[in-house]
C-alpha cells in the first residue's frame, strides 16, 4: 500500500507435496487399485495384497531383507516410500487312490514344492481282470492324465492342497482258443471274454464219425 503507516497482511499460500510409492513385487503383480501416490493429508490406508502364482504373500516390508514389516500408510506420513514384497513358495501333497484295485497299497503321501519337478511313484496297485493305464486327477478319468512314473511339475499352485491321483484301468480281454483236432465249431462260440463276462455256455463241436464228449482245458 502507498498509504503512510499502513499495515499490510501477507498470507502464505501452500500446495501439498505429492509423494511416490514404489513397490518391489519380487515376481508378483500389484492388485487393482494399489495406491502409488499420496500426500500428508491422505487418510490412513492399508496396503493391498499382491498376487504371485504358486506363492503365498507374507507381507510388505520397508527393507530388502524383509525385516521391518508395514501394513499401512498413516495420515501425516511424508516422503517417497519403497515397499518390498515377501513370498513363501507353496507346497502341496500327492496321494494315490487304487480306484477299484483288488490288491496292493500306496499309503505314502508325497510333499511337493511349487516350481520343482518330481517323479510319480510307480504303481503298486493290482486289479483282477484289468490293466493299469496310468493316473488321473478325476476318478472317472476326465481330469488331467499322467503316465506311471511320469515327471510332474506344479500339479497345483494352491498352498497346502492334497491332490489325489486315481488309478485308471481298462478291462483285460482274454482269448479263447479252440483245439478242434479236425472238428468244427459254431460261430456262436466266443473267441474272447472279460473277467466280468457272464457265464458262457459253449456250444458243442462237430466231427464226422465222432461223438463230441465235451470241452477241456488240458489235452
Regions found by a protein language model. Give the residues of each.
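Secondary-structure capping and domain/repeat boundary segments
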Residues: 1-219
